[in-house]
A protein has these predicted regions:
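Q-loop/switch helix immediately C-terminal to the Walker
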Residues: 83, 89-105, 113
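Conserved ABC ATPase "signature" region
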Residues: 108-126
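Conserved beta-strand
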Residues: 4-7, 14-25, 56
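Conserved Walker
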Residues: 41-42
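ABC nucleotide-binding domain signature
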Residues: 31, 71-89
Length: 126
Protein backbone atom coordinates (compact mmCIF):
# COMPACT_ATOMS: atom_id res chain seq x y z
CA UNK A 1 0.00 0.00 0.00
CA UNK A 2 1.16 3.53 -0.80
CA UNK A 3 -0.15 6.32 1.43
CA UNK A 4 0.26 10.00 0.65
CA UNK A 5 -0.50 12.05 3.76
CA UNK A 6 -1.00 15.81 3.34
CA UNK A 7 1.66 16.07 0.60
CA UNK A 8 2.75 19.52 -0.57
CA UNK A 9 5.38 20.26 -3.22
CA UNK A 10 6.71 23.78 -3.65
CA UNK A 11 8.43 24.90 -6.84
CA UNK A 12 9.84 28.38 -7.39
CA UNK A 13 8.29 29.51 -4.07
CA UNK A 14 4.82 28.51 -5.29
CA UNK A 15 2.81 25.44 -4.28
CA UNK A 16 2.79 22.86 -7.05
CA UNK A 17 0.47 20.50 -5.19
CA UNK A 18 -1.05 21.23 -1.79
CA UNK A 19 -2.33 18.94 0.97
CA UNK A 20 -2.76 15.87 -1.25
CA UNK A 21 -3.79 12.70 0.58
CA UNK A 22 -4.55 9.32 -0.95
CA UNK A 23 -4.17 5.59 -0.22
CA UNK A 24 -3.43 3.13 -3.01
CA UNK A 25 -3.84 -0.54 -2.17
CA UNK A 26 -1.64 -3.26 -3.61
CA UNK A 27 -2.91 -4.23 -7.05
CA UNK A 28 -5.17 -1.19 -7.32
CA UNK A 29 -5.01 0.77 -10.58
CA UNK A 30 -4.99 4.54 -10.30
CA UNK A 31 -5.08 7.29 -12.90
CA UNK A 32 -3.54 10.69 -12.23
CA UNK A 33 -4.85 13.34 -14.55
CA UNK A 34 -4.83 17.10 -14.65
CA UNK A 35 -3.25 20.08 -16.35
CA UNK A 36 0.43 20.11 -17.15
CA UNK A 37 2.60 21.44 -14.35
CA UNK A 38 0.35 20.50 -11.45
CA UNK A 39 2.52 17.82 -9.84
CA UNK A 40 1.46 14.46 -11.30
CA UNK A 41 4.97 13.45 -12.39
CA UNK A 42 6.48 14.97 -9.25
CA UNK A 43 4.15 12.85 -7.12
CA UNK A 44 5.23 9.67 -8.93
CA UNK A 45 8.89 10.68 -8.75
CA UNK A 46 8.49 11.05 -4.99
CA UNK A 47 7.52 7.38 -4.65
CA UNK A 48 10.82 6.46 -6.32
CA UNK A 49 12.64 8.81 -3.96
CA UNK A 50 13.83 11.18 -6.67
CA UNK A 51 12.15 14.09 -4.88
CA UNK A 52 10.72 14.34 -1.38
CA UNK A 53 7.68 16.44 -0.49
CA UNK A 54 8.14 19.82 1.16
CA UNK A 55 5.34 18.92 3.58
CA UNK A 56 3.59 15.70 4.50
CA UNK A 57 4.75 12.11 4.35
CA UNK A 58 4.70 9.06 2.11
CA UNK A 59 4.35 5.56 3.51
CA UNK A 60 4.92 2.36 1.58
CA UNK A 61 3.56 -0.72 3.32
CA UNK A 62 3.43 1.31 6.53
CA UNK A 63 7.06 2.49 6.38
CA UNK A 64 7.73 6.21 6.12
CA UNK A 65 9.70 6.92 2.96
CA UNK A 66 13.01 8.44 4.02
CA UNK A 67 16.61 8.07 2.89
CA UNK A 68 16.86 4.56 4.38
CA UNK A 69 13.55 3.31 3.02
CA UNK A 70 14.29 4.77 -0.42
CA UNK A 71 17.09 2.25 -0.97
CA UNK A 72 14.77 -0.62 -0.04
CA UNK A 73 11.97 0.70 -2.26
CA UNK A 74 14.29 1.08 -5.26
CA UNK A 75 15.11 -2.64 -5.04
CA UNK A 76 11.48 -3.61 -5.64
CA UNK A 77 10.15 -0.85 -7.89
CA UNK A 78 10.79 0.66 -11.28
CA UNK A 79 9.98 4.12 -12.54
CA UNK A 80 10.00 5.32 -16.13
CA UNK A 81 9.58 9.07 -16.55
CA UNK A 82 7.23 10.53 -19.15
CA UNK A 83 10.17 12.18 -20.94
CA UNK A 84 12.31 9.13 -21.63
CA UNK A 85 15.48 9.73 -23.63
CA UNK A 86 16.74 6.19 -24.19
CA UNK A 87 16.28 4.93 -27.76
CA UNK A 88 13.89 1.99 -27.40
CA UNK A 89 12.43 0.48 -30.53
CA UNK A 90 9.53 -1.39 -28.94
CA UNK A 91 7.29 -1.26 -25.88
CA UNK A 92 8.75 -4.64 -24.93
CA UNK A 93 12.26 -3.11 -24.73
CA UNK A 94 10.88 -0.24 -22.63
CA UNK A 95 9.27 -2.67 -20.16
CA UNK A 96 12.48 -4.73 -20.01
CA UNK A 97 14.70 -1.71 -19.25
CA UNK A 98 14.14 -1.51 -15.46
CA UNK A 99 15.02 -5.20 -15.04
CA UNK A 100 18.49 -4.55 -16.41
CA UNK A 101 19.01 -1.84 -13.77
CA UNK A 102 18.01 -3.91 -10.73
CA UNK A 103 20.51 -5.66 -8.48
CA UNK A 104 20.40 -9.48 -8.43
CA UNK A 105 18.35 -9.66 -11.63
CA UNK A 106 19.38 -11.40 -14.84
CA UNK A 107 20.74 -8.99 -17.42
CA UNK A 108 17.67 -9.56 -19.60
CA UNK A 109 14.27 -10.69 -18.38
CA UNK A 110 12.70 -13.71 -19.99
CA UNK A 111 10.04 -13.25 -22.67
CA UNK A 112 7.56 -14.83 -20.24
CA UNK A 113 8.34 -12.15 -17.64
CA UNK A 114 7.76 -9.40 -20.20
CA UNK A 115 4.48 -10.97 -21.37
CA UNK A 116 3.31 -11.20 -17.75
CA UNK A 117 3.92 -7.47 -17.37
CA UNK A 118 2.02 -6.78 -20.59
CA UNK A 119 -0.92 -8.75 -19.18
CA UNK A 120 -0.79 -6.92 -15.82
CA UNK A 121 -0.91 -3.59 -17.67
CA UNK A 122 -3.70 -4.74 -19.98
CA UNK A 123 -1.46 -4.44 -23.05
CA UNK A 124 -0.98 -6.72 -26.03
CA UNK A 125 2.54 -7.41 -27.36
CA UNK A 126 3.29 -6.23 -30.88
Amino acid sequence: MIEFDNITFIYDNKPLMQHFSCCISSGEKVVLYGPSGHGKSTLLASVAGFVLPDEGSIRINGKILDSVAIQQIRRITAWLPQEFTLPFETVEELIAAPFRLKINQPSRPTRETILNHFARLGLEPE
